[in-house]
């Protein structure tokens, strides 16, 4: 599916906010701005700036998901609510997770429209063209000091997720900073939520910088999958997207050693990968290619990752040091390291 857009606002009966839905393949991003000073969205923007408020999850039964998670200790964001139009009805409910981030459960089995009630098709003057992005691979949250295990337990006990992978400060560190991370996943592995917390280091880590500028815990980055990262990144760069700086040339010379047996199946040209500053890593199941944007708003908070998996199930552990050194170079420019 190519890029499409939808609009919801005053003309569609929504009186307190305006929203634009940006879609490509299985990706749906809803960009919302408040229309009134008293809107709770304004409170969120004043404290956090632009960022992710709602992480929506598709469920078979939004009522059951809500009541079960509340019974297990979740804090309510919205009780089950039915919204309808000529295409049917959507049931939504929601709970809070870390910080002021919420999970909204969306039940769409009785809805035949393209998105949700309250939205109409929007034709963009920018004439957008698809860039090969497919779906959200994972979404990473940053939490405060010594809070990671609390939220790991939340996802285990309340959401029924499992701890898929764990990384400590011995694995994720540079000369100056460190962090710890645990990856939570649902039963089929389709949903993956890594949770990061700061660790002791000589200087301020990227997690501490995020917490300071975002005003607390929140979504650090959204990883979006592609089947052809070279084409996708080339198109994004041509349209002005800025990515983190490339690792040193020694990094790319070591790719055959890093990939080991998987080097035989690698089709991508290493020179082109280096030209685009794409990073490569491997695990026992295959290899992956990934690259990270700079923050997409004025505050150094939310950014995006583009990832192509060639069998690998991990998160590029072999790239952690090179990635975080690149982030630290950006922090040094901002004077926040």
Regions flagged by a language model, labelled:
Residues 1-28, 71, 80-86, 93-96, ...:
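Core segments of cupin and vicinal oxygen chelate
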Residues 22, 29-31, 41, 51-55, ...:
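Short, structured motif recognition centered on aromatic/hydrophobic residues
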Residues 52-55, 112-152, 162, 215-224, ...:
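N-terminal beta-strand motif that seeds the catalytic metal site of vicinal oxygen chelate
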Residues 105-111, 197-199, 307-311:
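Short beta->alpha transition motifs characteristic of CBS
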Residues 188-209:
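Active-site-adjacent "gating/activation" loops or surface patches in catalytic cores
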Residues 191-193, 215-296, 302-309:
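Long compositionally biased, domain-poor regions of proteins
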Residues 290, 299-337:
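TerminUS-proximal long segments
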């Amino acid at each position: 599916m190519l890029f499409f857009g939808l609009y919801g606002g005053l003309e569609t009966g929504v009186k307190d906010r305006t929203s634009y839905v940006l879609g490509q393949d299985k990706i749906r991003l809803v960009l919302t701005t408040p229309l009134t000073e008293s809107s709770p969205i304004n409170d969120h923007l004043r404290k956090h700036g632009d960022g992710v408020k709602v992480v929506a999850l598709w469920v078979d039964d939004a009522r059951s998901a809500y009541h079960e998670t509340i019974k297990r200790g979740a804090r309510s964001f919205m009780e089950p609510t039915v919204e309808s139009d000529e295409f049917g009805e959507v049931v939504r409910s929601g709970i809070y997770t870390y910080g002021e981030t919420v999970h909204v459960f969306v039940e769409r089995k009785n809805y035949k429209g393209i998105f949700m009630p309250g939205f109409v098709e929007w034709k963009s003057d920018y004439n957008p063209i698809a860039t090969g992005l497919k779906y959200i691979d994972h979404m990473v949250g940053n939490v405060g000091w010594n809070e990671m295990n609390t939220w790991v337990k939340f996802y285990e006990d309340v959401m029924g997720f499992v701890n898929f992978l764990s990384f400590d400060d011995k694995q994720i560190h540079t000369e100056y900073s460190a962090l710890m991370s645990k990856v939570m996943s649902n039963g089929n592995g389709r949903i993956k939520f890594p949770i990061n917390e700061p660790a002791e280091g000589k200087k301020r880590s990227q997690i501490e910088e995020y917490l300071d500028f975002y005003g607390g815990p929140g979504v650090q980055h959204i990883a979006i999958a592609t089947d052809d990262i070279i084409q996708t990144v080339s198109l994004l760069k041509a349209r002005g997207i800025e990515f983190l700086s490339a690792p040193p040339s020694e990094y790319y010379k070591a790719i055959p050693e890093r990939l080991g047996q998987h080097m035989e199946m690698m089709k991508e040209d290493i020179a082109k990968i280096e030209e685009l500053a794409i990073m490569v890593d491997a695990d026992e199941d295959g290899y992956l290619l990934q690259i990270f944007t700079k923050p997409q708003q004025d505050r150094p908070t939310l950014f995006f990752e583009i990832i192509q998996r060639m069998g690998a199930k991990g998160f590029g552990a072999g790239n952690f040091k090179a990635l975080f050194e690149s982030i630290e170079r950006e922090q040094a420019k901002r004077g926040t390291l």
